[in-house]
Structures are given as structure tokens and as C-alpha cells.
Regions:
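Charged, low-complexity intrinsically disordered regions
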Residues: 1-191
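ASCE P-loop NTPase motor core, strongest for the SF2 helicase catalytic module
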Residues: 194-195
Length: 195
């Protein structure tokens, strides 16, 4: 590996490795540590980090906390997890497909916040949030009967526009929320700067 290649990429991990090895072989790796220290990127603060809904390094529990706070989800509908039992609205990331899904989202879809404030009559807020987690833009389609048991779907422009407006409101609310609480801000700023 050339010097340019060595001093690029994930230089934080390379420095950690070089620091571990230099203890046993200082004569071989002291120059590596010095060179890697000089190319370390500066840490960013929260205002310099752009986090979107759907970022996979945000923990599912934090996405749950956000949506529960935003929609004022009733306690009885919120996620409950233990070794032997789980219930309520829960957000999961499928590690194989890297798709997010919200389990039991129907528990609260009729609340005013879920159906009107951040949702529409055609698409509730939990469905909009799940679509947003998967980095997709919401689209509302109407089923059109063609006769003989056949049908097709057409985009409903008006309902799609309303749902996208709600989606954008959620995105803006998340940007304000994610770094608002100091402990959560520190956790994700540190994670971002270390990877």
C-alpha cells in the first residue's frame, strides 16, 4: 500500500491499530503513528452533521422515541420489550435487506396527530414515517377498476402532495429533535466522529 493510500480512508481506525502495535514494535510503527496523527480529520459538532430519517446508525429506540414524542403516542401503544415479551409500536431494521419496518403501527393510526397533524385521511403518520425511514418519497395511489376483475393503480396527485407535505414536516421535526437532548447529541456526535 502506498503512503497516499495508507494516509487516506478510515485513518481513525488505522491510528487505533498503529497505536496498539507501536507498543510492541516502536521501531517499526512510530513513524506510522506520527503520520496518521497529522491526517486525522477534525471532529465535527452537531450543527455540521446532517442526519436524515433512515440513517442506519441511529438506534431504532431513538426513532421510536422521536415518533412517540412527535405524535404523542399513548403509553399503551408504545413499545414494550423484555426478555420474554414485547408489544406495542416498535421500529426494526432488517439487517439483511437494510429495510426499516414499523410493527403494530395500526395501534395508534386513528389519533389526531397520526391521522391529521402528521398524516392524512389516506396515509397515517406511521406509514409516512416508515416510508421515510426507507428513504422513499410517499405516494398515494387510487385503485381503478378496469372490469372483468382487472384493475390498475394511478397516482392521486392531490393526496400525494398532502402526504409529502406531512413527510417534509416530519423530516424538519427530526432534524431539530435528534440533537436537542444533550446525551443523545453526544452519543451520535461521538459515533459520527469515530467512524
Amino acid at each position: 500500500e502506498t503512503a497516499d493510500e495508507y494516509l487516506s480512508g478510515n485513518v481513525r481506525d488505522k491510528l487505533r491499530l498503529a497505536n496498539a502495535v507501536v507498543k510492541e514494535h516502536p521501531e517499526l510503527f512510530a513513524d506510522n503513528v506520527t503520520a496518521l496523527e497529522q491526517v486525522q480529520p477534525k471532529d465535527l459538532d452537531a450543527s455540521e452533521i446532517d442526519v436524515r430519517i433512515g440513517t442506519t446508525w441511529i438506534e431504532p429506540e431513538d426513532y421510536e422515541a422521536f415518533i412517540f414524542e412527535l405524535l404523542d403516542t399513548p403509553r399503551r401503544s408504545r413499545a414494550v420489550r423484555s426478555t420474554y415479551y414485547s408489544s406495542g409500536i416498535q421500529i426494526h431494521l432488517n439487517k439483511y435487506t437494510m429495510e426499516w419496518f414499523i410493527e403494530n403501527k395500526s395501534y395508534d393510526k386513528s389519533s389526531v396527530a397520526a391521522s391529521k397533524t402528521y398524516g392524512t385521511s389516506r396515509m397515517d403518520a406511521y406509514t409516512i414515517f416508515e416510508t421515510t425511514l426507507n428513504l422513499r418519497t410517499v405516494t398515494v395511489r387510487d385503485r381503478i377498476e378496469d372490469g372483468d376483475g382487472r384493475y390498475h393503480y394511478e397516482i392521486n396527485q392531490k393526496e400525494t402532495m398532502l402526504a409529502r407535505e406531512k413527510q417534509n414536516q416530519m423530516k424538519e421535526a427530526f432534524k431539530e429533535w435528534i440533537f436537542a437532548e444533550p446525551e443523545r447529541r453526544n452519543k451520535y456526535v461521538n459515533y459520527y466522529n469515530e467512524t
